[in-house]
């Protein structure tokens, strides 16, 4: 007779979860940030709001974003005028778009990750799908399973409406799945399309306008598994994870799904709240490893906006190059919500290889990945790089 203990031992992986492959995708429509204010005020029939347009121009100039990718192009917006208004009932039109497009963009990223992984997709045992864009049943996880031709028995997890911290959440969940299920290979997909949040300008809610200056579309996918086979090539180990709600941060970042789409609200002091509490999160994560110099680790931080990165750097005395990969992704893609940190992970390993830096983490062994979002919720992931 086999004991429960023996069964449990046999079910668990030996080693830590590893990221084995990364893929990213964006819609084809690329938007230049320098000309975006003119386009945005024209397409939303708001050109009479000249002062607000100047304010929006300044927001775009300060955003440190060069370009973004958006599914919503001029043609689609002209066909859907309700999406261009500030507060017109438009949820049906938005839902009709994202329910189809979110899994499609996710498929593009997933296909690239599976190709890099190099194993048959029939070996994928679990799927985690995450999006803040739209809600449906059966969900985007089901649609992606069908689009990719995954096994019907794949174990699916659908995460809707999490927000910008969720790139950390999916890695935390994937780590637990991979380490507690021997032989598990988890496909993680974050796919975000701003068709739910796009709306015309108003001078009564400037936080909505901040979102219009920052958000972009993108999807990223990773394969996570423990005990890699010789044919699999791990990129990063997922060593430790945590999630916490910051003190005194209620209402700092909110999103509400309404007839008018997903509305976005934020308090001015989001950068202050994050920078004030970041050291506590780092001590909890790195003290057990004997690390207290945060310039000695590599950094992947969700680029909610330039002010967050600036204040975190200042608070911790980080060298400018620490946030290089993070700022590069912000500059080239904007804030893609949950997908951002996975784009940064991809950027970091690519640059590390290009520059011959010795490890996937800019030549360093240990690193941190931070997700920040509604709550104010912070996800922390401790990463260990792999020798190149």
UniProtKB/Swiss-Prot annotation:
Write down a Pfam family by its short name: Chal_sti_synt_C
What keywords were assigned to this record? Answer: Acyltransferase, Flavonoid biosynthesis, Transferase
Pathway per its UniProt entry is: Secondary metabolite biosynthesis; flavonoid biosynthesis
GO annotation terms (biological process): flavonoid biosynthetic process; polyketide biosynthetic process
Under catalytic activity, the entry for this protein gives: (E)-4-coumaroyl-CoA + 3 malonyl-CoA + 3 H(+) = 2',4,4',6'-tetrahydroxychalcone + 3 CO2 + 4 CoA
Question: GO molecular function terms here?
Answer: acyltransferase activity, transferring groups other than amino-acyl groups; naringenin-chalcone synthase activity
Q: Which domain of life is it from?
A: Eukaryota
**Catalytic residues (UniProt):** 164
Enzyme superclass (EC)? transferase
Question: Which cysteines share a disulfide bond?
Answer: none
Supply the EC number(s): 2.3.1.74
Record family assignment: Belongs to the thiolase-like superfamily. Chalcone/stilbene synthases family.
Q: What is the role of this chain? A: The primary product of this enzyme is 4,2',4',6'-tetrahydroxychalcone (also termed naringenin-chalcone or chalcone) which can under specific conditions spontaneously isomerize into naringenin.
What this protein is called in its record is Chalcone synthase 1
Q: Which organism is it from?
A: Glycine max (Soybean)
């Amino acid at each position: 007779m086999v004991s429960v203990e023996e069964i449990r031992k046999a079910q668990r992986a030996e080693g830590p979860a590893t990221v084995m492959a990364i893929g990213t995708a964006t819609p084809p429509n690329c938007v230049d940030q320098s000309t975006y204010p003119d386009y945005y005020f024209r397409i939303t029939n708001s050109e009479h709001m000249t002062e607000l347009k100047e304010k929006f121009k300044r927001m775009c100039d300060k955003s440190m974003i060069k370009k973004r990718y958006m599914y919503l192009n001029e043609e689609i917006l002209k066909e859907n005028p309700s999406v261009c208004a500030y507060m017109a009932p438009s949820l049906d039109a938005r839902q009709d778009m994202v329910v189809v497009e979110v899994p499609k963009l996710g498929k593009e990223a997933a296909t690239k990750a599976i190709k890099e992984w190099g194993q048959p997709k029939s070996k994928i045992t679990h799927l985690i799908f995450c999006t803040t864009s739209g809600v449906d049943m059966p969900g985007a996880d089901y649609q992606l399973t069908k689009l990719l031709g995954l096994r019907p028995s794949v174990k699916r997890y659908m995460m809707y409406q999490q927000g910008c911290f969720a790139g950390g959440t999916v890695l935390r969940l994937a780590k637990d799945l991979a380490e507690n299920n021997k032989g598990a290979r988890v496909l993680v997909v974050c796919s975000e399309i701003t068709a739910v949040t796009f709306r015309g300008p108003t001078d009564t809610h400037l936080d909505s306008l901040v979102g219009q200056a920052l958000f972009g579309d993108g999807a990223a996918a990773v394969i996570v598994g423990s005990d890699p086979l010789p044919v699999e090539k791990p990129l990063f180990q997922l060593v430790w994870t945590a999630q916490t709600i910051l003190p005194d941060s209620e209402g700092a970042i909110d999103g509400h799904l309404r007839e008018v789409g997903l509305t976005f609200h934020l308090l001015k002091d989001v950068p202050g709240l994050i920078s004030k509490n970041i050291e506590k999160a780092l001590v909890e994560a790195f003290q057990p490893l004997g690390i207290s110099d945060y310039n000695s680790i590599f950094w992947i931080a969700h680029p909610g906006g330039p002010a967050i990165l600036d204040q975190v750097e200042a608070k911790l005395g980080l060298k400018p190059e620490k946030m290089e990969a993070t700022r590069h992704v912000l500059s080239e893609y904007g804030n893609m919500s949950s997908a951002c940190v996975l784009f940064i992970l991809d950027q970091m390993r690519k640059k590390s290889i290009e520059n011959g830096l010795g490890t996937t983490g800019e030549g360093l062994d240990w690193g941190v990945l931070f997700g920040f979002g509604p709550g104010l919720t912070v996800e922390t992931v401790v990463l260990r790089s792999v020798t190149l």
